[in-house]
Design a protein with these regions (language model features):
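Short beta-strand scaffold segments in enzyme catalytic cores
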Residues: 103-105, 116-119, 150, 237-239, ...
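A short, polar/charged loop-to-alpha-helix boundary motif
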Residues: 131-144, 254-269
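N-terminal active-site segment of His-dependent metallophosphoesterases
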Residues: 2-55, 185
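CN hydrolase (nitrilase-like) catalytic-core segments centered on the catalytic cysteine
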Residues: 82-100, 168-257
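Short beta->alpha transition motifs characteristic of CBS
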Residues: 64, 71, 118, 129-135, ...
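Active-site catalytic loop in hydrolytic enzyme cores
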Residues: 3-9, 79-82, 108-207
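Cys-nucleophile CN-hydrolase/nitrilase-fold catalytic domain and related Cys-dependent amidase chemistry
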Residues: 34, 43-126, 190-217
Length: 269
């Protein structure tokens, strides 16, 4: 269950003094092909696990892609949580590799749709977060998140989640930090902003590093590559340390996995 204690009353918790290997899985996503994307994610998760990853982050909507024609189409790709196939896939992978995994998907609850990040671990489903700041056509198809910004206690530390545009607002990071999160896992689809001067392609890495520094917290952001109608994705996945510096990345515009060994107890120093 999420921890939502006031800042002044955080109880003592288990501290992991050993580094946790964090992996951001940067992959292409085939639009509207869930079977292919799950198979591909499985291969990437296996690779990350073979390199000792204990916490893995997948991109935003990693099973479906992002651009749709209308709400009816979005609804046809939505799943329930935790019963749906995508969540159960992540549960299976977490148990198989004794790892924690974060990934974003389209969630259905009744007639409402959400952009939802899932956290699974070695013991199964842990919790979910629903995107607060909807972007582009999402505002016509999905509901803003209604779960707040939970922080989940795990054996490796306190984990929080954000999704894409959430990471462009400093308040979201601050809410994670005030609840004593050790690491924020961001599933995102950073798109190429043509107005930025070279060599910059997106504001994502800069904002990630700035908010890691200002909140003395680890931030791991996994984005994607490839293109969809009207959008192209330049990569740039990054893991930032408590001093704001990049521990890994920004990643190039190719399928890859970046790794960083993060001593999550550094957030308490």
């Amino acid at each position: 269950m999420p921890d939502q204690y006031p800042y002044s009353s955080i109880p003592p918790i288990y501290r992991n003094e050993n580094p946790v290997r964090v992996a951001c899985i940067q992959t292409d996503v085939k639009l509207k092909d869930i079977n292919f994307n799950i198979k591909h994610a499985k291969q990437m998760i296996e690779e990350a696990a073979s390199h000792g990853a204990e916490l893995m982050i997948l991109p935003e909507l990693f099973t479906t892609g992002y651009t749709f024609q209308n709400r009816k189409e979005v609804y046809s790709y939505a799943e329930t949580v935790p019963e749906g196939a995508t969540c159960q896939f992540l549960v299976e992978q977490s148990k198989l590799y004794s790892a924690y995994i974060v990934g974003s998907m389209i969630e259905r609850e009744g007639d409402d749709l959400y952009n939802c990040s899932i956290l699974t671990g070695p013991d199964g489903f842990i919790g979910k977060y629903r995107k607060l700041h909807l972007c582009g056509d999402e505002i016509y198809w999905m509901e803003p998140g209604n779960l707040g910004i939970p922080v989940f206690r795990t054996k490796i530390g306190r984990i929080s989640m954000l999704i894409c545009l959430d990471g462009f607002y400093p308040e979201t990071y601050r809410l994670c930090a005030l609840q004593k999160a050790d690491i924020i896992c961001v599933s995102t689809n950073w798109s190429h902003v043509k107005a930025l001067p070279a060599p910059y392609k997106t504001m994502g890495p800069t904002l990630t590093m700035a908010n890691a520094l200002s909140n003395h917290i680890f931030v791991a952001a996994a984005t994607r590559i490839g293109a969809e109608p009207g959008l192209d994705y330049p990569g740039q996945s990054i893991i930032a340390g408590v001093n704001g510096g990049p521990l890994a990345g920004p990643a190039p515009d190719t399928e890859t996995i970046i790794y960083a060994d993060c001593n999550l107890s550094d957030t308490r120093k």
